[in-house]
A protein has these predicted regions:
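Alpha4 helix (beta4-alpha4-beta5 surface) of REC/receiver domains from two-component response regulators
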Residues: 16, 63, 85-102, 111-112, ...
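Short hydrophobic/Thr-rich beta-strand motif most characteristic of the beta2 strand and flanking loop
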Residues: 26-33, 41
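Receiver (REC) domain active-site loop signature in two-component systems and cognate sites
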Residues: 56
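Conserved acidic carboxylate
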Residues: 9, 83
Length: 125
């Protein structure tokens, strides 16, 4: 069964780009534009992995992950952070991020990071 990835990105063009490539790799993608929407989405359906921007309106990626990781069902979900500012890497790692990719986003790096934590074979099974 295909794995589900939650994409949290406030920039619509970036969100569409990520969705396009993840769908093409065989994943199910749910996309939202901020941390509040992500928290609500995770209550409805627990994703297998989260790809999240750090700097977003309403609730940033760090705040969102801190809240989500406090839930037992979410504590082991891998998180890949995306940001234009690499200074928050240590904070992201403390919150349980498994990868920290900088913008401008290299699609190949994102797909490699996702496949590392959700192998493509599993996504297409």
């Amino acid at each position: 069964m295909p794995k589900t990835i939650l994409v949290v990105e406030d920039d619509a063009d970036m969100r569409a780009l990520i969705n396009h490539h993840l769908l093409g790799a065989g994943y199910i993608v749910r996309a939202v534009s901020n941390g509040l929407e992500a928290a609500a989405s995770c209550l409805a359906v627990t994703p297998d992995l989260i790809v999240s921007d750090v700097h977003m309106p309403r609730m940033n990626g760090f705040e969102m992950i801190a809240i989500l990781k406090s839930e037992p069902a979410m504590e082991r979900i891998p998180v890949i952070f995306l940001t234009a500012d690499a200074k928050g890497r240590r904070r992201g790692n403390k919150l349980g991020a498994v990868e920290y990719l900088t913008k401008p986003l290299k699609v190949d790096a994102l797909l490699e990071a996702v496949a590392k934590h959700l192998p493509v074979e599993d996504a297409r099974a």
